[in-house]
């Protein structure tokens, strides 16, 4: 558990999202904290961005692993072509894939998110302070479980403490 980190974040990323800062954080977790497995939900937005950065880090450090926790096989059914292609690229290069269901239902996202938290000690989020969201729900659960969370969204840093 101590060597794993999950990602949780919003689909829409704000102008404050900094890919380089995000990359540096996963690199520090790998090199300084020994994190070797990064767990990604494979969703549009933050998940795909972070999954791609893990693959970049993997080019430098072959011990790094990408673990996809997909909520269901048809997760991308309503996505545009570009987002589907980016998700497929993650699937093609992932070291591990968990996908408990074929079809979407009202429980798959929460189940996936909690399983990611249960598997990891660290978490990286992009949380903008919106308290009614899957990201907020996941972060509340992670806090109750005692996980160490790093937030990349500037406007959500104060809000994360109030969850």
Predicted regions and their residues:
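Acidic/glycine-enriched connector segments
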Residues: 1-163
């Amino acid at each position: 558990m101590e060597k794993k980190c999950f990602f949780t974040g919003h689909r829409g990323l704000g102008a404050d999202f900094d890919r380089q800062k995000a990359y540096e954080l996963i690199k520090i977790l790998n090199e300084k904290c020994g994190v070797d497995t990064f767990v990604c939900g494979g969703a549009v937005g933050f998940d795909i961005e972070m999954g791609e950065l893990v693959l970049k880090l993997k080019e430098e450090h072959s011990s790094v692993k990408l673990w996809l926790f997909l909520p269901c096989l048809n997760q991308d059914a309503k996505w545009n072509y570009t987002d589907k292609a980016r998700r497929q690229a993650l699937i093609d290069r992932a070291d591990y894939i968990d996908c408990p269901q074929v079809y979407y239902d009202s429980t798959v996202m929460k189940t996936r998110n909690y399983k990611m938290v249960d598997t990891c000690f660290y978490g990286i989020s992009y949380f903008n302070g919106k308290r009614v969201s899957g990201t907020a729900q996941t972060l509340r659960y992670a806090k109750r479980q005692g996980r160490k969370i790093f937030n990349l969204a500037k406007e959500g840093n104060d809000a994360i403490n109030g969850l």
